[in-house]
């Protein structure tokens, strides 16, 4: 019996019997894409915005999460009267291929019809595979062209892949706090997290569900390690400094009293294992590591966008050391080389990579302004 800390719950899904051919050469004979929508699709089906989530996100972008009860992960940006205005636009967000919130992934049953899940045997996927699965959903919804595709971090990678693979299907693209490839440093951090999962005694070679356990300790450490990269030193100092949980530190047993930042990271790890699957973490982090748009186009990033009519807004954050501003500037130069319509804005913030998820007024004004201008150019009322 599966003793996963989070139950299998019903999600809104679209099923595709024709499956999906993956970049690795494997064909998924059965594909399900879990998704949520907000707002109304207009009669012309021209007001759709696709939101692409990051590594540990899901489709519940603007509503309480069904497992945790927490507000939608991008409530700051998406909703009625917000920069991505659900009173004006039809907003779609899908759980990525390989995820664990309803879309086909390691928790899904194998193609041959057995009740056992894919688990660690789920095939390797790419960010482009994720986008092709999303395109099936968009086609199924009857939408010929998306007004915009918006996403941050890994979501931004998906935005870039959409604009490269299906330029005629995307009027505007907003890749945020992202890059056209995953750096060696980012791959290294991911590998530390993966090794923490692999070496957890409850991992069982990736078949932990058949043993009724999960590699909770390893997954928690992976989350803790990753979470450090999402913050800046200034943000950590402001929030925690060197504050101890209690003042009389040396009176505590063994190693003394813990620092507040330690407790914070432990909370991040322990709460994460209640809503995320370890095998999905392995699959998705590897997909991010494989992402390299230039390598896919003969080493030329500009070639990935040659002939595009999509208009772009690139956004970076000054204190983001996971996806630094230099990488967004490189994307802007590549787009300029093919005469693409591109704007680039660096938001000054000391909140690190996660600033794109937080209350950043300059960022919100930037996105709202771009979407308003793009809507006017697209003839949207």
Curated annotation (Swiss-Prot):
Pathway: Amino-acid biosynthesis; L-methionine biosynthesis via de novo pathway; O-acetyl-L-homoserine from L-homoserine: step 1/1
Disulphide bond pairs: none
Top enzyme category: transferase
Catalytic residues of the enzyme: 153 (nucleophile), 320, 353
MF (Gene Ontology): homoserine O-acetyltransferase activity
Main subcellular location of this protein, as a coarse class: cytoplasm
Domain named AB hydrolase-1: residues: 47-359
The organism's place on the tree of life at top rank: Bacteria
An example Gene Ontology biological process: homoserine metabolic process
Catalytic reaction annotation: L-homoserine + acetyl-CoA = O-acetyl-L-homoserine + CoA
Name of a matching Pfam family: Abhydrolase_1
GO cellular component terms, A-Z: cytoplasm
EC number assigned by the record: 2.3.1.31
Residues that coordinate or bind substrate: 223, 354
Subcellular location: Cytoplasm
Keywords: Acyltransferase, Amino-acid biosynthesis, Cytoplasm, Methionine biosynthesis, Transferase
Subunit organization: Homodimer.
Purpose of the protein: Transfers an acetyl group from acetyl-CoA to L-homoserine, forming acetyl-L-homoserine.
Family: Belongs to the AB hydrolase superfamily. MetX family.
Protein name: Homoserine O-acetyltransferase
Organism (species): Acidiphilium cryptum (strain JF-5)
Organismal lineage: Bacteria, Pseudomonadati, Pseudomonadota, Alphaproteobacteria, Acetobacterales
Gene: metXA
